Amino acid sequence: CGLYKSKAEKIKSTSEKICNEYNGEVPDNLGDLTKLPGVGRKTANVVLSNAFGQDAMAVDTHVFRVSNRIGIVDTQTPEKTEFALMDAIPKKRWSHSHHLLIFHGRRICKARKPECEICPITKYNRVKNRRTKCQ
């Protein structure tokens, strides 16, 4: 069932690589983190933000959906969304914004049946004088 074997193998190989190549210390930069097996930009940015307190913009399914739906960005991929959000949001607010977008996506701006009628953003958001996709 599922990808548990694959995930377990990646966790094991990542742990070995951290022990062998990084003296048991989790890397604190995007380049080294993304060299670890199974670690992409999203995971690396979450680690940088949550474990190391660095400014980072992690784009998961909620961040991607919400930021595109409400018109902060107009992108087709998580990576393009990450860079567009980094341009649109002051660096000191990246990590906090990431968490707020996730929360909003889970509670109000859901993938199916978004609750636009109670969305506090919809009525105020105007990007380049265009209405949001919810309106």
Where in this protein do the model-derived segments appear?
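Catalytic cores of DNA base-excision repair glycosylases
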Residues: 1-133
